[in-house]
């Protein structure tokens, strides 16, 4: 009899263990997606996201200012200066969350033009060709002091509205086109992030299965790679906003993290870049205490730490730089049957060549994914997910490039870009939205078979049919 009782008890325990393994405990993780947003409201055309922890955010859609393969070093530094200016404008209690969404698509002509036979055949040739596209969003979030939850402060709210418009004006003055997402657009963007689907017109949600390495959802899975391991920060001593590659024995500058748009097998990549703006006086005081603590125990590692802190304090005093808490992660989405280890190997090898060793202990996959939702960045763990650095150094790790797109011009001359898909350019430099010159003369020169006849045919069509 005792044996039967023991066997029944063991069977019950096995059943409970199987249930917990398959369906979870039904605790906090079960409702983790329900505990993010309170609502999304419209405020004078701006979609404002309210989180259940009391923060509110606005989303700016923008285009990165540096054209890929432009070899313009100054433009990389100009972006760093712009970001430093935005940090100064926002000040304490705000966070800047930049999301670069890299998407693998198939080419299709969406111009809705009634092409003649020759042009129609041209576009049919490229239909279905895979290429990489990119979208960029900048999310401004105001922190809510947890002790003041459920107490509305009209002054802070008005300050938030003023500052987000200041940010938009600053970016416009710097030549970076931006616009705020409305309420419906913000909702769609959040849904697309949740579904990890940025290319289909209709999206659907699926069940999530989470383990220590990946997050599976329907016919796809993703993995979150934290760029910096807080316990052992492996970054180069000197960071620049660009790195050099060799092209035909010539050095060419590219973005420091340009590798994010060429990850093998990836269908979608989201590069999350977060800057949290703390109280500067408090952080300097904490740095001073840390320096004194290291100095009280003289050994080689502590002496190096003291020297590093002194250098930072000297830069802040001389150049009025700002301290920020930072977090960077990559969310890589692949088909369910793809080998995610290939993406891991590619990222580890590529970043190690830059002197950056990505974290191998990002076991909190679900928490990193949820805290990377637009407007939910303050959910990042203060002790484990954020590290303190200067705003200039953090800006170097941001993605600054955009892929060349079709120009806004009535004189569209199509050539293929480096990915092999048609892109329209204005060869005159004076008909498009962005004027390069007010007068231009040109002639067509090229060897046999290079496309001179087709080129002149397009120009004749546009000019003599009065399409300009």
PLM regions and their residue ranges:
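Extended, folded cores of ATP/NTP-driven motor/assembly subunits in large transport
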Residues: 3-400
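Glycine-rich phosphate-binding loop of nucleotide-binding enzymes
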Residues: 49, 65, 73, 80-88, ...
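Pre-P-loop entry segment of helicase/translocase ATPase cores
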Residues: 387-399, 403-422
């Amino acid at each position: 009899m005792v044996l039967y009782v023991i066997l029944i008890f063991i069977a019950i325990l096995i059943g409970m263990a199987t249930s917990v393994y398959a369906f979870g405990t039904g605790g906090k993780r079960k409702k983790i997606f329900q505990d993010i947003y309170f609502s999304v409201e419209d405020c004078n055309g701006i979609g404002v996201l309210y989180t259940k922890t009391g923060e509110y955010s606005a989303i700016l859609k923008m285009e990165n200012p540096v054209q890929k393969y432009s070899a313009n070093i100054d433009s990389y530094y100009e972006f760093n200066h712009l970001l430093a200016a935005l940090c100064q404008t926002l000040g304490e209690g705000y966070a800047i969350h930049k999301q670069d969404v890299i998407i693998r698509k198939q080419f299709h002509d969406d111009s809705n033009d009634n092409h003649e036979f020759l042009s129609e055949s041209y576009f049919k040739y490229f239909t279905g060709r895979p290429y990489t596209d990119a979208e960029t969003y900048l999310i401004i979030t105001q922190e809510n002091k947890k002790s003041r939850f459920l107490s509305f402060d009209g002054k802070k709210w008005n300050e938030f509205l003023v500052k987000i418009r200041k940010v938009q004006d600053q970016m416009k003055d710097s030549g970076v086109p931006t616009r705020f997402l409305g309420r419906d657009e913000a909702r769609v963007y959040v849904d697309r992030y949740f579904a990890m689907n940025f290319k289909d017109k209709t999206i659907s949600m699926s069940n999530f299965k989470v383990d220590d390495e990946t997050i599976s959802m329907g016919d796809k899975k993703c993995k979150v790679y934290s760029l910096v391991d807080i316990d052992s920060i492996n970054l180069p001593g000197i960071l620049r906003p660009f790195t050099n590659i060799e092209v035909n024995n010539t050095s060419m500058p590219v973005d420091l993290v340009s590798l994010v748009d060429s990850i093998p097998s990836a269908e979608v990549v989201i590069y999350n870049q977060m800057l949290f703006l703390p109280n500067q006086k408090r952080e300097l005081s904490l740095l001073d205490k840390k320096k004194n603590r290291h100095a009280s125990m003289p050994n080689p590692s502590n002496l190096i730490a003291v020297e590093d802190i002194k250098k930072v304090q000297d830069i802040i005093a001389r150049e009025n730089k700002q301290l920020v808490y930072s977090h960077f992660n990559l969310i890589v989405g692949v088909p369910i049957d793809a080998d995610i280890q290939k993406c891991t190997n590619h990222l580890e090898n590529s970043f190690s060549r830059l002197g950056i060793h990505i974290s191998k202990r990002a076991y909190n996959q679900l928490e990193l994914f949820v805290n990377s939702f637009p407007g939910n960045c303050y959910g990042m763990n203060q002790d484990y997910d954020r590290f303190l650095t200067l705003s200039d150094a953090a800006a170097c790790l941001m993605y600054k490039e955009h892929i060349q797109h079709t120009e806004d011009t009535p004189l569209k001359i199509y050539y293929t870009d480096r990915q092999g898909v048609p892109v329209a350019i204005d060869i005159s430099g004076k008909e498009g939205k962005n004027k390069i010159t007010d007068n231009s003369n040109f002639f067509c020169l090229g060897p046999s078979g290079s496309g001179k006849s087709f080129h002149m045919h397009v120009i004749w069509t546009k000019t003599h049919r009065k399409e300009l």
